[in-house]
Structures are given as C-alpha cells and as structure tokens.
Amino acid sequence: VTLALLYRGIMWLMGHSEKLEDLLEGKPIVVVEEGQLAWEKLHAENMTEFEFFMELRVNSVEQLGQVRLAILETNGQISVFYYPDEEVRAGLSILPAHCTTRYTTIPQEGIYACVRCSIVMAMQAGEKRICPRCANAEWSKASRAKRLT
C-alpha cells in the first residue's frame, strides 16, 4: 500500500512539474535532423554510431538522407520519420563498415559523406579534405538510395 501511494504521489507531482518529469524520465533527444547525424548528442547518451545505425537498419533505413527526423526516446527506442521518396537526399550509408569503402583521398568527382558526422559535400577527384564539422578525414560515397518498404 505504501509503495502504491508513493507511486501515485510521484506520478501526480510529475504531472504538475515538467522539471521533475524531465529529471525522473528524461527528455527525448533529436539525433538525426534533415539527414544529418547529431553524433555529439549520441555520445552524450552513451550510444555509439554503430548501435544507432543498427537500430536504423532494423527500421529499414539504408542511408541518412532518407531520414527527416530520428528521436531517441526516453525508453531507449528510436522513432524515425522519413522523407517521401521524391524528397530523399544524398546521405551517409549506414550499412556496416565492410559494406562501404572509406577514402582519405577522393577517387572520383562526386558527392561524399563524412563517415563520422554525416555531413554531405561535393568533392573533386584527388581531393583530401578534413570535415569542417568534426575534423574527420574519412569519407564515403554518399548514397541516394530510396527506402524499400
């Protein structure tokens, strides 16, 4: 009985105090916005890109340009909101590393994505570029794959 009353009291307080609710339950965190990974937010939540990409693959995501918004919910699940096919943009492939090639020197002109933070940039053959967002030097060819449902 005491536990039930304590639980009801806490739930009532949380219903009347947003700060207390945030303290006890946490806040949902936007981890992908407009196809761009917020890797610093993932790391703050002690989640690696590998774990996150696995969760996205389970949700039929092949590349980040398919994702308009992804939210790490307070219960650990990931909510994914997709672009319609006609709005899908080039993005970082989230297939496992052995399925994609990484470059420090760009082999041919095209659109490439930083393998760490997912920023997408046009690059020329022979170019060696440090990512302006995260200072990483590795790039992969950006994917334009649409979702298959």
Which residues fall in each region the model found?
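Short Cys/His-rich "knuckle" micro-motifs
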Residues: 122-128, 140-145
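Membrane-cytosol interface motif
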Residues: 22-42
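Short cysteine-rich clusters marking metal-coordination/redox-active sites
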Residues: 113-117, 130-134
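Flanking scaffold residues of small Cys/His-coordinated metal-binding clusters
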Residues: 108-112, 126
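A broadly conserved sequence feature marking short terminus-proximal activation segments
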Residues: 53-109, 145-146
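Transmembrane alpha-helices and immediately adjacent membrane-cytoplasm interface residues
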Residues: 1-25
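ATP-binding catalytic core of ATPases
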Residues: 49-51
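Transmembrane helical hairpin unit
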Residues: 12, 18-19, 43-45, 60
